[in-house]
Amino acid sequence: MSVFEPHTEIIRKGKGSKPNEFGKLVKIQEAENQIVTHFEVFAERPADSTLLLSSIEVHQQRLGRIPRMVAADGGFYSRESEKAGQALGVRWMSVPNKKTTSSERKLRQHQGWFRRGQKWRTGSEGRISVLKRRHGLRRCLYPGLDGMRRWVGLGVIADNFIQMGCYLARQST
């Protein structure tokens, strides 16, 4: 793929305008007030469905509590992760199962709490877009995988400073 960056992978997006992109998979976790609490740049692309449970555990380690709600897109869904998340104490698991034929599951995915979780997830997609546009995550200017991790980390820190400043400004008015 790249002579200069041999760690680069092809990421199949399936979009009509850009079906393939090049880079690494970056996972972003966001909490209240649009603060990114964790990010990870993967050396090799794992299946999205294997990432959900570790995200809940990272949230618990960093913030000292299990999240009340977990929202993710359908790629993160697996029955095992959903059951394990609920066993850990997550009250609402808003992760759609697009392949379901169960009427019970379809009804669950139309409940208010599930839809609120998916709206939150849509907002998190906006955070990714902001990181790409405002903080230059479209293209990494540092060489190597460690350079990419550093580049993403600096973008996350910069965005968190902006979000904290906005939050404090709202509190003082």
Question: What residues fall within each predicted segment?
Answer:
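Polybasic low-complexity intrinsically disordered regions
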Residues: M1-G74, E82-A84
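Structured core elements
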Residues: S2, K27-Q29, H38, A71, ...
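Helix-centered, glycine/charged polyanion-binding patches within enzymatic domains
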Residues: G74-D146, R150
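A short, flexible helix-boundary coil/loop motif
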Residues: R134, R138, G165-T173
